[in-house]
Amino acid sequence: MILIIGGGVIGLSIAWKLIQIGKKVLILDKNKLGKEASWAAAGMLAGRLEAEPGEEKLFPLLAKGQLAWPKFAYELENISGKKVEYKKDGTIMLACDFDENNKLKSTFSFFKKNKINMKWLNGEEIRVKEPYVSTKVLSGIFSKKDHQVNSRFVLDALLTVIKRNKDKCFIEENTEVKEIISNKNQVIAVKTNKKVIKVKKIIICAGAWTNKIKNISKEKIPIRPVKGQMICLKMNKNQPLIKHVLWRNNIYLVPRNNFDLIVGSTVEEMGYNKDLTAGGIFHLLRIAREMVPAIEELPIIDSWTGLRPTTIDDAPIIGPSKYL
């Protein structure tokens, strides 16, 4: 039996792949499965536009991850019978003033230098693609290969597949792992808020809550929560405002097939605080309105916060622990 701590997209995907090769897994989650960062996520697959100076070593991994998504989505949809809304319309990063335009030119040069294929667009070319974009938008970078997926649909599809395999996958929700018990660097059990579970193999997918587990490492794992506030607006189905993902100053607009429009996300170092704030919502709507003014007429149908698991260098932490 392999124990997986955390039932978000990563934990559930690992469970699915282990089941496929005949392994038995037990998934523990402190809440309901998939109700934290994966539920909050907008589903942007922006491994190209998110490439930054100083992170060049990550580029091959980002590219490999993006290339894996079409096959992953296709297989998951076929097996689960559920749609995950993998969309290939692309993403446009926008500049609305002189300073932003200069910064965007620098970003475009960086992409070109690192052979990340993008297309430079002037304001008129952007408005051909997206007629409702503000006339104040001066320029943009179009990334055809930065796609999106509906993260909540992905969760639903993964849960459907996993729950069909009741003989191989066991789930315990509202079960928080408090401590890992080991002997001579070998895991022997985990202590939860309910009981002690004997186990020899653990896969930790606890995200922002990783460091709340005692004895997970002799040193603090460099993961911290970063809060993001988000809003969902409803577009007119007969006149949807945008087709592509739009992105400016770290704020993005993500259109869904059901005409929802996701506006996100703040980036706040607030520990485990998940409050929605007037300032956070105002910031999102202000930037969004500057990109697409007609947004001000759309009804707000939902809002939420999520806690991203974040590292100092933005790199994922993958691999075996030398302490356990």
Where are these regions (language model features)?
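Active-site substrate-recognition segment that forms the wall
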Residues: W16-I21, L28-K30, G43-M44, L49, ...
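Short loop/edge segments at beta-strand edges and connector loops
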Residues: D29, N122-G123, E173-T175, D302-W304
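A short, glycine/Asx- and small/polar-enriched loop/turn
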Residues: D99, E130-V137, I181-I188, T310-D314, ...
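N-terminal Rossmann-like FAD-binding beta1-loop-alpha1 element of flavoenzymes
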Residues: M1-I27
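Helical element adjacent to the flavin cofactor pocket in flavoenzyme catalytic cores
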Residues: G140-K201, C205
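Conserved Rossmann-like nucleotide-cofactor binding loop
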Residues: I10, L33, W209
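Dinucleotide-binding Rossmann-like beta1-alpha1 core, especially the glycine-rich loop
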Residues: M44-E125, K129, A288
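Helix-loop-beta segment of a Rossmann-like dinucleotide-binding subdomain
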Residues: K82-A95, T107-F108, N114-N165, T266-G271
